[in-house]
Amino acid sequence: MNPKTPVIVGVGQVLNRSKDLEEAVEPILMMLDALDQAEKDSGVRLLSDVSSVRVIRGVWDYGDPAGYIAEKIGCDNAETIGTLFGGNQVQAVLNRSCLEILEGKQDLVVLTGAENGSSSARARKQGVQLASTVIEGTSDEIVGSQKPEHHAYEIARGIKQAIQVYPMYENAIRYARGESMDTHLARGSEL
């Protein structure tokens, strides 16, 4: 095996589904917790050896979350990368990370991101401001290209969210296959 073959050595996931806003956890703390879990999952101490910290953009106001994380995990000299918004960013950054490891440009990369959308929505409805760490600065690099998310035709009709678009895709697939609603539902459910 090529010694530069990229390998995922640890994973961590944090879920914060409490309905109590007092128990809401802000995204940067969830990211740090997930990285701690990933390090434990790997079975070795490795976070301080990270060469690049990569954070997927979320709905938060942090300037350089990757830099903040690098400092907290003890790899102050690590490259810091952020992304633009986009559902494809996790896969795009994972792909890039693997290629850079394979090419010898990176040794150990952490990839993280977090949202507290449910807590944020609940807080907005209740007129409550959730605690948020102020993180200034800018990552060494921001990856991704910001293209218009919606066509003018969609915008004119108020179609702005994935939950509004994907049903149209599903109906187009169903129609193209000549399937009834029941047949399409059964086929999709088997996937």
Give the positions of each predicted feature.
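Blade-loop segments of beta-propeller domains
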Residues: 86
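Conserved phosphate-binding catalytic cores of ATP/NTP-utilizing and phosphoryl-transfer enzymes
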Residues: 91-99
